[in-house]
Amino acid sequence: MEKLKFNYENNTLTIKILGDIDHHSAKNVRENMDKLIFDKKPSLVLMDLSSVEFMDSSGLGLILGRYTTCEEIGAEFRIIKPAPSVSRILSLAGIERLMKIEGGYRNEA
């Protein structure tokens, strides 16, 4: 799990992605995140994107897939601290209409 750091406390799973998310890394990150989510069964999953400077469409797929996974187990899913470059991609994709984004990027509408 070299691309992830995680903390599980008070039924909250915080997963920090380390490095860029592209088609080369997304599969490994997805598999490791799913394992953590299904093993811990948290009520809240926080995906920390503060260390991600680049994300392509594979990253959007990763986010949407983990959102769906969390819905399936009854957990809430939030993105926290996205870097400015990632915030722009999230904004263009309209991700804030599906899930909460805290810190870094905010929907000011």
PLM feature spans:
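STAS-like cytosolic regulatory interaction modules
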Residues: 1-53, 68-109
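Histidine-anchored nucleotide/phosphate-binding helix
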Residues: 63-66
